[in-house]
Amino acid sequence: MTAPAVPPGCPVRPTDTHGLTPLSATTGPDPARVHQELRETWGSVARVELEPGVPAWLVLGYRELLTVTRQEKTYSRDARNWRDLAEGAVPPGSALLPMMAHRDNVIGYDGPEHQRLRRPLVDGMAGTDQRRLRRSVEAVCAGLLESFTGRGTADLVGEYARVVPLLAIGGLFGLDRSEGHELLRSLAALFSGPNASRAGSRRFEDILTGILRERRAAPESDLTSAFLAHPDLRGDSEILQSMVVMISAGNETTTSWIANTLRLMLTDRRFRGRLRGGRLGEDEALDEVLWQDPPMANFPARYALHDTELGGRAIRRGDCLVLGLAAANADPAVRPADPYDMLGNRAHLAFSAGPHACPARVPARLITRTAVEIALRGLPDVTLDVPAAELPWRPSPWTHCPASLPVRFTPLPAAAAAPGGGP
């Protein structure tokens, strides 16, 4: 750890990033070690570097994170309050901007405007037919398993965990499978470099605009029709942005949840034994993953609206604060040492907290639980095809998620992948 020791309460010059730990170090192979070293050096709020020359505060403490997420009049979600961005310290081509720049949607506002834009999302999730969604996810999962069960090998991230959520969420909006796969390709392009990103963004919005037009002409029982009818959404632009937020955010986080649950099954003998032996229910297993590896390890961001103090640190107006969801979950001030003491405990911060907490936790759990159930049933003797220490990790400062899960299993006939099938 190279972060300089600074006495609690001592202000840090906002432009000084010399020796600071890169935020990306907290999502590498051993994030717990990095979190521990940051706590030992800084306490519950640590100074880190987002990218060269761009500092931020990483909120490591559970109670401090609740303070930041619940006090909108002190900590804003609106990136237009970010001093380093406003003063040009963040370059126009920064890789931070896709996640952190202001967006004219529910993510980019606080207060009444945020509440107005959030209501359609909350109402849409409340109106989701859970049985219908589960049947849809089962069919998606079975189809994906069928594509590789006869082969005896697969990548359970690229061929499964990354595909299931987008097809399931796309289905909620009325997209068929071919449109869902095309949406997946456009999302991949979004993160493939500037030229491909622009083309991917255009295609992504084109697909959603198409379904928007179809549902305006002929409404159905899907989220697109619900958004069109919702009185709080004003015009196609707001409807489209709401769709983009739901699909992109839901896909990324649910992918990570599925991937990390499967990874634990393949690499953690204790976790696998408790789940397969019936000592750990499926929902308890999913909650253990949320405590240990939340879908977003770090979440951007809040921006101080005035000078304040947090965790013994002097926070200046315009400072950026990153929500360390994984670190806060592991805060020794609230986390018992014995994992058995966590069974049934959903006080984790995997979905954040406060007014901007995730509104889609119920469908996300349903999609994840179904995907894990069908993978375990359809691949009963699945094993990791590389040493656990050699698993690659996604190069992201935001998610602690394997880039791939190469596995091997006994080849099975296609029918074994269907819901209710298998040995």
Question: What do the PLM-derived regions correspond to, one by one?
Answer:
Residues M1-P423:
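Cytochrome P450
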